Amino acid sequence: MGEKRNSCKNKKIVFMGTPEIATYALNALLEKSFDVVAVVCQPDKPIGRKKEIIFSSVKKLAIEKNIKFFQPNKIKEIENELKELNPFAFVTCAFGQFIPDSILSIPEFGCINIHASLLPKYRGGAPIHWAVINGEKETGVCLMRTIKQMDAGDVYCSRKVNIEESDTTSTLFKKMNNLVYDIVLNDLEKVFNLEYPPIKQDESKVSFAYNISKDDEKINFEKNAVEIVNLIRGLSETPGAYCFINDKKMKLFKAVSTNSKSNNAPGTINNISKEGILISTKDFDILVKEVQIEGKNRQEVKNILNGNSEIKIGVTLK
């Protein structure tokens, strides 16, 4: 055990990541006693209506652990500083910036990325969302070599997790957080020790998970019930799948497919009860249990039954 811990301590790591999931990787590096000499994360950005500056999860952890951190607009800006650190490797997780070859060539071992999918499936910035939206039954994380082409490097190892029908992107993120921690804690050192041979990705099986756009968030009731429910699951809790009711945006949450069918046009509200709103689709109705109308708080359908709600039987959602 002593030799393994020492081998970690002797490896200088620069970690690059920004959101919460990346803190699980950084914590695992620290738990494993890697010498994390610096952290690189995205610049602070104003958030919400008040435009408050809120530190990213990784920046907060770097401050807490007293680790030097950088926040360049483009990583090229700190090329000299990174060279001076003389790192053994870069480790990245949800960093959010393109890393050019001039930076990738700095560390002795190169750059290892923790990617939240089972590559070659779902290359890109939103693999967890798209796994749920597309109704996948499993996903995972892998350790891969970073090259110039996005998420196209050789894969060293992976860990899998099941996606339940009840999972949303929010609940799946929690599972993936733990998986990220486990793969860094248990497998990264083996990658550095050349115990895992790199495996080339099968280019014939590549798919992409581009960042979610506003168009992706819009519900199309001409699709079937399962597809719509998966979209709602895949965009919960944020950014939320939406439609329009009387020209107002309405987000839908906690939806399930039913066995009932109506002859009404897709998007029609067929029934409202304490169980939820029953809405027509291309095939079976869906039951939606929570909504958020533009300008109002998110609420359970049972709490709006007695109000003067715009949600009425016969209304068609667009």
UniProtKB/Swiss-Prot annotation:
It catalyses: L-methionyl-tRNA(fMet) + (6R)-10-formyltetrahydrofolate = N-formyl-L-methionyl-tRNA(fMet) + (6S)-5,6,7,8-tetrahydrofolate + H(+). GO terms for molecular function: methionyl-tRNA formyltransferase activity. The keyword Lipid metabolism does not apply. (6S)-5,6,7,8-tetrahydrofolate binds at residues 117-120. Belongs to the Fmt family. This is Methionyl-tRNA formyltransferase. The lineage of its organism: Bacteria, Bacillati, Mycoplasmatota, Mycoplasmoidales, Mycoplasmoidaceae. GO terms for cellular component: cytosol. InterPro entries: Fmt, Formyl_trans_C, Formyl_transf_N, Formyl_transf_N_sf, Formyl_transferase-like_C_sf, GART_AS, Met-tRNA-FMT_C, Met-tRNA-FMT_N. Its EC number is 2.1.2.9. It holds the Pfam family Formyl_trans_C. SUPFAM superfamilies: FMT C-terminal domain-like, Formyltransferase. The gene is fmt. Gene3D superfamilies: 3.40.50.12230.
